[in-house]
Structure formats: structure tokens, C-alpha cells
Amino acid sequence: GRMADDTVVLTPPARLAQPVDGAIQRRFGEPIAGGGRANGLTFAAEPGARAVSPATGVVQYAGPVKGWGVILILRLAGGYHLVLAGLERTSVQVGQSVAEGQPVGWAPDGRQSAAEIYLEVREQGSPVDPMKWMRKRVG
């Protein structure tokens, strides 16, 4: 049983920084090609752009996942998890602590695959809409 999970008090992130400078191309809940709905946000990125961590956390996974490029999974302080996907490569390792805004990798150069970065936030394993925590970029 998973009864013990019910006693865990989760604290949502106070805010999330955009992983890359770029427009949001797909929002949470929007229909996606092939069926289903988006579980996160997709940002347009400049080819080869540096991607930064949207929040402070600890790297739980860093590596390639078929169809998603290189992904990062962070465990945030409040018990939430954050997934960053679509990276070309990362500059962090499992177990490493990262700060909000810290560079963690690079977007693709755009030749092989679109320079898009995907952001997903999970609450006890279920995707939730990151928009409510997105810090508005000034400018």
C-alpha cells in the first residue's frame, strides 16, 4: 500500500524560472499530435542555447531518453519533481545540487531536432500545470 504517502506534506515551488528564453509553444493540457494532452510546457529555444534550472533541487536523473533527447529530473525541496527534456547534453550529474537559474545544459543546435525545451512538474508522480509558478520574465 501507499498509505504512508498521505502523511507527506508537499510544498510547491515558490516560483519557477524559464529554462530558456523563448515563447511557450505548447501549454499544459493542450492536445498533442498522436493523441493525449501535454503534461507540461514546451518552450522555443535558440539553437544551442544554455538551459538553466527552473528551480533549486537535487539531480535525480540525467541522461538520454528515447524520443525526449537528454532529460534531467530534479527533486525539489518541497517534494515535487521537475523534468527538463529536449536537451542536447547536460552539465550536471546525479546527486548534484542545483540552484534556480544555474546552467544545467544546452538546447539542440536545431539541425537534427527542433530546439525546444520541455518542462514538467510532478506532484506525487502526477503532472501539474507549471504555469502557476512561472516567474514572469521581465522584458
Protein language model annotation of sequence segments:
Residues 1-69, 73-75, 127-139:
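Extracytoplasmic/periplasmic cell wall- or extracellular glycan-interacting regions that localize
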Residues 55, 76, 86-88, 121-123:
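Active-site proximal loops enriched in glycine and acidic residues that flank catalytic Cys/His/Asp
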Residues 42, 73, 83-86, 106:
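Conserved beta-strand positions that form and line the central face of beta-propeller blades
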